[in-house]
Amino acid sequence: GQWVPQISSKRLGLVVDGVTFGYPEIMADFQTLKARYPQAFMVKSDDYTNFSGKDFWVTLVATSFGTADETNAWCDQQGFAEQDCYASRLMHTGGPAGNSKTR
């Protein structure tokens, strides 16, 4: 499968930099990212087997790469902080093992 950059994951009640995320904050986060990356899309973590966390709204970029390292290099080139972008592979079968690689 192809690797894509995961650039955000938020769930209800999550607190980041003093902001408590509800639906409006999750959507605002997505819209901000989509303005910078028009190919960004959002999925619910429960709909895919590669995510270990449940109830997350995950923003990914529809720019695919053959390897996790290539994906993470894209994250570096875009200037993302290490924890804000990493390689992910969307899967409907299997589990999280081997389907994400942090930087």
What are these regions (language model features)?
Residues 1-103:
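Acidic/polar low-complexity segments and flexible, solvent-exposed patches
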